[in-house]
Every structure is written in C-alpha cells, then in structure tokens.
Amino acid sequence: MNLHEYQGKQLFAEYGLPVSKGYAVDTPEAAAEACDKIGGTEWVVKAQVHAGGRGKAGGVKLVRSKEDAKAFAQQWLGKRLVTYQTDANGQPVTKILVESCTDIAKELYLGAVVDRSSRRIVFMASTEGGVDIEKIAEETPEKILKATIDPLVGAQPFQGRELAFQLGLEGKQVAQFAKIFVGLAKLFQDHDLALLEVNPLVIKADGDLHCLDAKINIDANAMYRQPKLKTFHDPSQDDPREAHAAKFELNYVALEGNIGCMVNGAGLAMGTMDIVNLHGGKPANFLDVGGGATKERVTEAFKIILSDSNVAAVLVNIFGGIVRCDMIAEGIIGAVKEVGVKIPVVVRLEGNNAELGAKVLAESGLNIIAATSLTDAAQQVVKAAEGK
C-alpha cells in the first residue's frame, strides 16, 4: 500500500525528522488559508497522487500569493494528473499539499528497501538527488552508496556517519544525517515498510539537512498489524479492477497489452507473460487465481479481464495439482457461458487429469482452443489476438 507525500511526512515528523510545515487541503479556500497558517511570502503547492513525475506534469508549483495557491487548487482538485508513472488516464487529485518554501543549496538521495538476496533492509544514498534512482543505478551504479541493517541490533549511528562522510557532508551535517538515517530505519521497521524514499534529501542554504519529499510503500502482507496505517489508505488511487479482484482474493495487475492472462500461481503467471512476449504478444494483465481455481473465481477473473476493452484474446494457463484439470475445465466452460465471452479463449491444462480436461473443453462446443503445450498456447493466443 502506498502513502501520499503528506502522510509520509506526517510519519517523518512523528520520528523527529526535519520536514516542511504544511497542510493537506481539499478545497481552494483551504489552500489559501493554509498559506496564512504557514506564513511567509512563498509556498510550494503539490498535487497528491501515488505517482512520481508530478513536477514535469505541472503537479508541483511555487506560488507567491494566496490567490495563486487557490488557483492551483481549483486547477487540480477533482482532476486527473497524468505522469510518466501513470497510465493514460492518470490519477485523481483529491488533496493538495501546501507547504513552506525551502531554499535549496544541494540535493541528495536517501532510500531503503528490503533486499531479497541478503534478507536485510538496505539503505541507499547518493549525491545525485532529485532524479530517478533507477536511472542512476543503471548508468552510474558507483554513485549509489549502501548500508545494510542488521535486524538484531537495528541501524547504528556509525553507519549513518559513514554514509555522511561518503556523501561529502561536513560538521553538523554528519550528526544530522546520522539522526535522519537512524530515524528512517526505525520508521521502516516499526511500520513494516517495503520501500522508503527521501528524494530529494536537501542541504538548505543555512547548511541544515531537510526531508523535502516522502515516498512510502507498506508491505501489504503486514497490514493486519498496522491498523493506524490502514486508515491512510486512499481508495481513489487504486485501479478499480485491481480493487475488485482483491475482494475475490485474485491477484490482478493491469498492463497495456491486448492478451488477457489467467493463471494459477504467481511464478507460472510471470512465466506465461514472458512466453507471450517471446512470441510477439503483449499481455494485458497479470492475474493469479491462486490454488483454488473454482468456477466462481474463474468467472470473476473473466469479468475483470474482459472489463479491459483492449483485450482481444484470453490465455488460460492452469496447472492441476490438488484441483483436477477436468473440474477446472468445467469451471472454465461455466464461466465462459455465464460471462458470455465473445473473444477467442486459449486454454492450456497440465497436471492432474489434464487429458480429461482437454476432452471436456473439446466437447463443449464453445470458442475455446485447447493448447497442447505452453509454447503452443502462446502461439495460438498471439494469432487469435491478431485475428489470424
């Protein structure tokens, strides 16, 4: 689950980290009032969406009057912001963050993720702040500094000081960085985060460090023990299809292709998408129906896939283990009849009673193409999507 910038900064402040004074508002009038509360003559107004690239898309602006802040809120509230990280529809803007202006001397990067290979929280820092860390990692990986957190003792101040020295910080900045480093690590562990970024972490004109942005992603598997963070969830930022799928315990992620994919098992689903790509197709989604591919779940899966108007064909790839393939085939047939699927459906069944499942599909009289292998399934669905 992602948090908005203003929510992330709220957590930062609770851990004593330096953030700008600001208010999240949902009306133009409140934006003007926020300027009065903050004081000063310049403010930064930011559209709140779960996506990066807001500045280039016009979603972040420096304003020098309350009228300009109000006009910015009128421009964006209730609208959708399209950035390079969103789809063509963009994300709805329901909040505007109004905060004090910061005089920036230098921008740094500080972030943390769970590293699967070391099974540790790993902090990353760089002198290249304010840009995409992925681009830095690809083009100049030597500019990314790392510190691994021991889960038994947590982040240690000396690790923060080491990173600070490597970043070229001096004097009071070293102690400030160490405090921010330890605070962020504690925040990461306390709230079961999957990702945390301060981009940029800035050096102000007076030499002090300041957290100018906040990006936080919480591990969805740990939400049951984070009741406070559950209240931070903004459903307006969710893809409606993904939200609907979650109600039926279906793991769905919308993509931009034209071949719908329905698979049982996350690994098999990723492999299926890869082989579709290999044969010239473009998956329209990732969809894992899980171990229990019942008629009800398959039916809902078809409904979700077909809600995407770009889908020209569907590939169903099921491995029968505990659940028999003939039962799965009957579920697919029932779902196709109930939903009224008009586009080609290619089905590959493997495992328990696979031959019987293929026979059931062949005798159904429906527009279902039984594939003999995964390669055959990929080739068949690509042809079907192209109308061949």
From Swiss-Prot:
This is Succinate--CoA ligase [ADP-forming] subunit beta. GO terms for molecular function: ATP binding; magnesium ion binding; succinate-CoA ligase (ADP-forming) activity; succinate-CoA ligase (GDP-forming) activity. The keyword S-adenosyl-L-methionine does not apply. Mg(2+) binds at N199, D213. PROSITE patterns: ATP_GRASP, SUCCINYL_COA_LIG_3. NCBIfam families: PRK00696.1, sucCoAbeta. PANTHER family: SUCCINATE--COA LIGASE [GDP-FORMING] SUBUNIT BETA, MITOCHONDRIAL, SUCCINYL-COA SYNTHETASE BETA CHAIN. Pathway: Carbohydrate metabolism; tricarboxylic acid cycle; succinate from succinyl-CoA (ligase route): step 1/1. The gene is sucC. InterPro entries: ATP-grasp, ATP-grasp_succ-CoA_synth-type, ATP_grasp_subdomain_1, Succ-CoA_synthase_bsu_CS, SUCC_ACL_C, Succ_CoA_ligase-like_bsu, Succinyl-CoA_synth-like. Keywords: ATP-binding, Ligase, Magnesium, Metal-binding, Nucleotide-binding, Tricarboxylic acid cycle. Its EC number is 6.2.1.5. Binds 1 Mg(2+) ion per subunit. It catalyses: succinate + ATP + CoA = succinyl-CoA + ADP + phosphate; GTP + succinate + CoA = succinyl-CoA + GDP + phosphate. Heterotetramer of two alpha and two beta subunits. It comes from the Bacteria. Pfam families: ATP-grasp_2, Ligase_CoA. Its cofactor is Mg(2+). The keyword Magnesium applies. Residues 9-244 form the ATP-grasp domain.
